[in-house]
Amino acid sequence: MEDNAGDCGGMTAFALRLAKRLADVGVSSNKNLVFSPASLYAALALVAAGARGTTLDELLALLGAASLDDLEESVRRAVEVGLADESASGGPRVSDACGVWHDETLELKPAYRAAAAGTYKAVTRAANFQRQPKRSRKKINKWVSKATNKLIPEILPDGSVHVDTALVLVNAIYFKGKWSNPFPRSSTTTGKFHRLDGSSVDVPFMSSREDQYIGFHDGFTVLKLPYHHRTMKNHGDGGDTITNSSITRAILEHYGGENVGLSMYIFLPDERDGLPALVDKMAASSSSSSFLRDHRPTRRREVGDLRVPRFKVSFYSQINGVLQGMGVTAAFDAGEADLSGMAEGVDQRGGGLVVEEVFHRAVVEVNEEGTEAAASTACTIRLLSMSYPEDFVADHPFAFFVVEETSGAVLFAGHVLDPTSSSE
């Protein structure tokens, strides 16, 4: 795996490969696309934490990690740095939450519970999937809605949680940030946006005369739009500004002064129909884990005409097929899945665990002030040959029948009102 210390290289490579897969579908159907690599990565990493054998190997390959320890370190770094909330100091609001719901008749293995709570900061809760699947689904959706500030009201659709559901693993991310240099609303004008098929549509374009971070490359140009973060004076350096956050200072030391905090990067192909080729180039790059970092603008430039459209994009899909196309097949195969690291006594209960469905939902809105976005990923896991121990206590009146199985002939029938009475 190609990765640099301190960077989320595995996640970046995963993001670009997944972007290609989802973009192929989006372009063919002429639909916009938004998804959260961070949310999907966290949810799939939760699956990997309980996977073994080929199931684990395929997940690690997809997520760009050499081992579970390597994966946990990558997730830890992402949570502590990439998803750090700086709203208290005037920066972007970022929240990330993970949850593990398991059927109340299943006990999580101590090692899995520890990993979920420790590395992934996940809440673990028992649910009554067998007897109250609809109620359990509503509770999980309510948790997601709260975690995403109501931008994702539902991640689990009707029927996705049922009597055979054993576990549901969920991630939810919320982001809201203001631009470091907001676009004046008075400068927003209507203009033509040219679609891939050659047609055009009138859209509101945000505009600015401020110097911007712009980088020029072979076949495409990159615009960096930083989000506002609180700054403080560096008294040892004559008044230069640095971030007032220990986490972003760590990034400052690693990357250098300009690449600090959170930013949106817009990759604009030179050709109007060049987006598919650009996405292919990103995904196929031999250094895909560092592609975004290597093409970040490093200095501000004077601009003449800067126009960026306002937009709001959403996405909701079950993505089993996409993940299988990227090499993760064993986890979905009842005959091959090995998720034996998740729950106690699974083998003794008549079958193993298998991933049933993976749902992903995301929404982003970009306007003159900044960006608001949210995403959620849910993995439903069922127990094969589900067989729960059921109580049968005949401590009240009952009927009985003696039946010949093949013919169905009833040899005897009756009922018992009082076992102590012979009732002759």
UniProtKB/Swiss-Prot annotation:
A cellular component term, taken from the record's GO annotations: extracellular space
CDD domains: serpinP_plants (cd02043)
Keywords assigned: Protease inhibitor, Serine protease inhibitor
Molecular function terms from GO: serine-type endopeptidase inhibitor activity
Role noted for this protein: Probable serine protease inhibitor.
PANTHER family: SERINE PROTEASE INHIBITOR, SERPIN, SERPIN-Z8-RELATED
Family stated for the protein in its record: Belongs to the serpin family.
Name of the molecule in the record: Serpin-Z2A
Species in which this protein is naturally found: Oryza sativa subsp. japonica (Rice)
Lineage: Eukaryota, Viridiplantae, Streptophyta, Embryophyta, Tracheophyta
